[in-house]
Amino acid sequence: MTGNENNLIWIDLEMTGLDPERDRIIEIATLVTDANLNILAEGPVIAVHQSDEQLGLMDDWNVRTHTGSGLVERVKASQYDDHAAELATIAFLQQWVPAGKSPICGNSVGQDRRFLFRYMPELEAYFHYRYLDVSTLKELARRWKPEILSGFKKQGTHQAMDDIRESVGELAYYREHFIQL
């Protein structure tokens, strides 16, 4: 399959923290939707191996969250380094979307893109330069139509694929209740 240039690539990363100069990617997941937000395919969910030393730099929130979800153990056992995870993700995306066509889609994807630029530059370059950031709509709704915010509840598992599915659902919710298309 050569892919459709109107398909959208959704991504979520879990990291050891928020600073790409110090912290590392520990999980990556992607999925592809069509332009109407129908999920076409889910990509690999990859725990990215990091050293015990790197994992030891996590703050309490990250230790609690990623240990509780089982991600820390998956990271320790993973055979994927940054580059292998990057290549596996690109191989999946090439089946669905031509390079340079899809904006990077998700929640707070500016943060994800900072980590991709540092640790997975080939994957970062696969995206169009634009962003489709659901958190922008959330912030606008909070200011302009706060009564709709309670209509969409996230589970908050902080597992990459769960978070992406929620982002797609959240955008569909805002499309109906905020943008009203």
Swiss-Prot record:
EC number(s) reported in the record = 3.1.15.-
Catalytic residue positions: Y129
Task: Please name the Gene3D superfamilies in this protein's record.
Answer: Ribonuclease H-like superfamily/Ribonuclease H
One GO biological-process annotation of the entry reads: DNA metabolic process
Residue ranges annotated for the Exonuclease domain, each copy included: 8-171
Task: Show the InterPro entries listed in the entry.
Answer: Exonuclease_RNaseT/DNA_pol3, Oligoribonuclease, RNaseH-like_sf, RNaseH_sf
Q: Which domain of life is it from?
A: Bacteria
Task: Name a GO molecular-function annotation.
Answer: 3'-5'-RNA exonuclease activity
One GO CC term of this entry? Answer: cytoplasm
UniProtKB keywords: Cytoplasm, Exonuclease, Hydrolase, Nuclease
Q: Which family does it belong to?
A: Belongs to the oligoribonuclease family.
| Protein's name in the database | Oligoribonuclease
Q: Which organism is it from?
A: Serratia proteamaculans (strain 568)
* Organism placement in taxonomy: Bacteria, Pseudomonadati, Pseudomonadota, Gammaproteobacteria, Enterobacterales
